[in-house]
Amino acid sequence: MAEGFAANRQWIGPEEAEELLDFDKATQMNEEGPLNPGVNPFRVPAVTEADKQEYCKILQPRLQEIRNEIQEVKLEEGNAGKFRRARFLRYSDESILSLIHLFIGYCTYLVNRRRLGSLRHDINIEAPQEEQYSSREQGTTENIKYGRRCLIGTASLYLLLFIGVAIYLGTTNAQIVWRLPPLVVPVEESEIIFWDCWAPEEPACQDFLGAMIHLKASTNISIQEGPTLGNWAREIWGTLFKKATRHCRRNKIWKRWNETITGPVGCANNTCYNISVIIPDYQCYLDRVDTWLQGKVNISLCLTGGKMLYNRDTKQLSYCTDPLQIPLINYTFGPNQTCMWNTSQIQDPEIPKCGWWNQIAYYNSCRWESTNVKFYCQRTQSQPGTWIRTISSWRQKNRWEWRPDFESEKVKISLQCNSTHNLTFAMRSSGDYGEVMGAWIEFGCHRNKSRFHTEARFRIRCRWNVGDNTSLIDTCGKNLNVSGANPVDCTMYANKMYNCSLQNGFTMKVDDLIMHFNMTKAVEMYNIAGNWSCKSDLPQNWGYMNCNCTNGTSNDNKMACPEDKGILRNWYNPVAGLRQALEKYQVVKQPEYIVVPTEVMTYKYKQKRAAIHIMLALATVLSIAGAGTGATAIGMVTQYQQVLATHQEALDKITEALKINNLRLVTLEHQMLVIGLKVEAIEKFLYTAFAMQELGCNQNQFFCEIPKELWLRYNMTLNQTIWNHGNITLGEWYNQTKYLQQKFYEIIMDIEQNNVQGKQGLQKLQNWQDWMGWIGKIPQYLKGLLGGILGIGLGILLLILCLPTLVDCIRNCISKVLGYTVIAMPEIDDEEETVQMELRKNGRQCGMSEKEEE
C-alpha cells in the first residue's frame, strides 16, 4: 500500500496528518453535533514517533482524501464553507459555556479559557479572512437554545432565592408552638378525669394501666397548687363499690321491704327518711366482705387520658397511686388514715363530719397510732347435736358434719372474745339505719383449718347491755343518763371475756339506694357449728385514733370526752377516709403545646419525628431533662434530644416494673399498656389534627411556626423581657404566658369550626361531581374498555415521542460500557480490498495483539 501511495500520490507524514485530522474533526461538527467529535490519535499523550508512523500507514487513504477536499475548497471572503461553520459553532458554544460559568460563579474561567488542555488547538488557515456570517449560518443551534433556557432558569432561581430570603426576614418575629413540651402543670378544677383501679389477682378491679405503679419519674419540679385526687373521692368511692359488687347484682332478690328511719329528735323538722330496703342473695358477697369491704385488698388508683399524679411528699410522677387499703364500709379499725375533726376545714357538705349528734365533746389534733392489739374468740356449741361422717360426691372424700338437734337457722351463733389491751370506745347506741341497738364494736377474725372445720374469716360484733327500749340508750360506761341516739363511753378491758356473735348482715347506702346485706346463708357455708376458735388478723399498720378532747359548756345529757384514750367507734367515713388518703396526690397533665419565641429555632436540636413511641417516652421520663422549674428554657431545648433518645429506656423500665410486680403480666398486659398509651397519644393528636395541619404542623414536628397574619390578628405578642433569651424556667414561662396558650386555643377552635378552605374544598368537590356525574351512568365494562383504549393510546404516543431519545441513550450507554470511541469512517473504493473500520478500544487497535501493536 505504501508503494502505491509513493507512486501516485505524495506521502503524508505525521505532522501534516495531524493537521488534516484536526480539520476533519472540525468539519464533522454540525448543528446537532458535539463540541469534540472523536480524538486525534496524533495528539494522544505519550504517543511515540513509531506510533505516528504506524498511524500514517493505516490512515493514509483517508488522509489523502482530506487533503484533496481541502484543496477543492474555495476560500473566498464571505464564504468559509464547513470550516467557517465549524469555527462559528465552536466559539458560539464557548460563549454559552462562558455565560453558564459566569452565572454559577466561575469568573476565572473567562481569564483562563484558552488553557483548556492539550487537546484544544486553533486550526491554522492559509490566509486570514474576515469573520462574516450569514443569518443562515447564525441560526439557533441546540447549544444556543439550551443556553438561553439555562440563562432563564438561572435567573429564575436567583429570583426565587431572593423572594425566599425576603419572606424569611419578614417572618423572623413569628411565634413558635412547641408541641408536647417536657413539662407538667396542674389540671383545672373543671376538667374531667378518667381513672380506673388496679389490684393484683382481683377480678373486680384489674386494669392493665396499673403496671405503671412502680414506674415513677424522680423530678425536681415544683408545681403550683391545684386540685388533688381527693377532690373526686365521692365519685371514686361510689365507683369502687360498684366494681366490687357488680357481679352480685345479677342474682335474684331475696327480700324487699320499706322502712322509716328517724333522726335524733324523732320525725321533728322533717328528719325522717322513708327508705326501700333490698336484701339480695348474699352468697356472691362472701368474698367481697372479706376482701374489698373490709379493706384487705391493696388497691391502686390509676389515671387515664394522658393525666398523671404528682406525689407532693415524694416529689415523684406516676400514673397510679401507691397501694391503698380502702375499706368500703364503716369499720372499727382502718388503715393509716387521719380525720379532720375541725369541721370548718371540710367544705364539702356531702362528706359527713367526724362526730355525732348531741355531744359536748370536741375532738382535735387527732392522729393515727398503730397498735398490736389482738382479739381472741372461741365458740362453744350451745345446742346438743352429733357429728356425722358423710360421703360427698362433689368433694371426692369423706367429711364430718355437725347435725344439731334444731335447725341451724335457730341456733344462736354466739362467741366469747377478749382483747389484749384496754380499749375505750366512743360508740353510738344504734347501728346505721336502725340496724342494731346498743353499743357495739366489730372486727375480723381468722379461723385456721382443722379436722372438722375449713379455713375461714368471720366478721364479729361485740355488744354491751342489749336492751329493748329504743328511746333510751343502754349504757355500758359511766354516762348513765344520756338519751337519744347518742354516743356512749364504753371500755373493753384487757383479757376479759365479752359475749359476741357472728355478724350476719349489715346495711349500706349506695347512691340513693339503701341495701341490706344478709350474710346468714354465707356464714352457714363456713360450717360454724361445733367448737372452734379464731384470732383477729388485722394488718400491723392498723390501729386507733388518738385525739385531744375538750368538753363544751352545755349541761345537757350529752356525751362527754372519754376518760382515757381509745378507739373511736364509727369515726371512719369511707368517703372522708378515701379523700384523706388521696390529698397528697395532685392531678397534673402534660401540656399539648406552649408558645415560645422564634429564638428557640436557633439553638434547638436536630428535628426528630414525634412518633407515638416518642410521645410515650415524653410522658414517662419527663425528669430526664429536669422537667418543670428546675431547668431553664434554653437548657430544656438543648436537652430535649436526650429525652427523645431514651424512649427505649422508658419501655425497659415498664418491663422491669411488670417483672417485679407479677411475672405473668410481662406478656399480654405489657402489650396492652403500650397500646393504651399509644391510643392516648393518638387521641391527643387527632383532637387538633385538622387545625394543626392547616397551620402547617403535622404529627412529625415538635416545633411549628404560626403564620404571621394569625398571630397579628389575635394580638399574640411576646414579652421578650420575661423570656430573657431563654434564661427562664419552662414552668415560670408557662404560668406567665397562659394568655398565649388561650389565644392559640382560640385559633385552633376557629380553624376547626369556621374553616373557609375546608368549605371551599367541599364546594369544589360537589361541583366536580355535578360535571362528572355522567361517568357514573356508563356501564362498568364500558369504563374498563374506555380506560384500556386510553391507556394503549397514551403508551403508543409516549413511545413515538421518546423512541429516538431512547435509542440514542441506549447507543451511548453501550459505547460507554464497551469503551469504544469512533475516530474516522474512511470511504473505501469498490476495487480496493475491504478494510475494517478503524476503532480503538482502550488505546489499542482492534484485531491486533498488544505485541503486534508495539
Swiss-Prot record:
Residue intervals passing through the bilayer: 784-804
Q: Name one GO cellular component term.
A: virion membrane
Q: What name does the UniProt record give this protein?
A: Envelope glycoprotein gp150
**What keywords is this UniProt entry annotated with?**
Cleavage on pair of basic residues, Coiled coil, Disulfide bond, Glycoprotein, Host cell membrane, Host membrane, Host-virus interaction, Membrane, Transmembrane, Transmembrane helix, Viral attachment to host cell, Viral envelope protein, Virion, Virus entry into host cell
Cytoplasmic domain ranges by topology: 805-854
**Cleavage (site feature) positions:** R609, A610
Instruction: Tell me which parts of the chain lie in the Extracellular compartment.
Output: 1-783
Native organism is: Feline immunodeficiency virus (strain San Diego)
Q: Where is this region: Immunosuppression?
A: 660-678
Task: Report the InterPro entries cross-referenced here.
Answer: Envelope_glycop_lentivirus (IPR018582), GP41-like (IPR000328)
**Lineage of the species this protein comes from:** Viruses, Riboviria, Pararnavirae, Artverviricota, Revtraviricetes
